[in-house]
A protein has these predicted regions:
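Positively charged, low-complexity intrinsically disordered leader regions
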Residues: 1-41
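Histidine-anchored nucleotide/phosphate-binding helix
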Residues: 57-75
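A glycine-rich helix N-cap at a beta->alpha junction
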Residues: 94-106
Length: 106
């Protein structure tokens, strides 16, 4: 039977699975316990400018917002951190969560 960790790494296109040998077998379960046992404020970094591509990333912000929405439902205060290129987009989809501009790229 596949674990959630197996499913996550099944379509690994960025070689993240090479880190698996350095992680606990149940890394998703351990991460969820860590989150649930530490309520409060969460910072989620997303939407950074890709120098080689000449544009802001587009796949990260929607997933980051979904994660933030789930954490809001669990009572967490969520802040998104992004650069000036992605800030308007992240603000547009982030509902009531605060977006902090971080000068990662000039």
């Amino acid at each position: 039977m596949k674990t959630i960790e197996d499913i996550i790494l099944d379509f690994d296109q960025r070689n993240i699975s090479s880190l698996r040998k350095h992680l606990p077998t149940n890394f998703c379960g351990e991460a969820s316990h860590l989150i649930l046992e530490n309520p409060g404020t969460v910072l989620i970094a997303t939407g950074f400018y890709i120098l080689a591509g000449g544009a802001a990333e587009t796949d990260g912000p929607p997933g980051a917002i979904a994660l933030g929405d789930a954490l809001n439902l669990l009572g967490y205060k969520v802040f998104y951190i992004t650069d000036r290129y992605s800030k308007p987009f992240v603000e547009a989809i982030s509902k009531d969560n605060k977006v902090i501009e971080f000068p990662i790229c000039s």
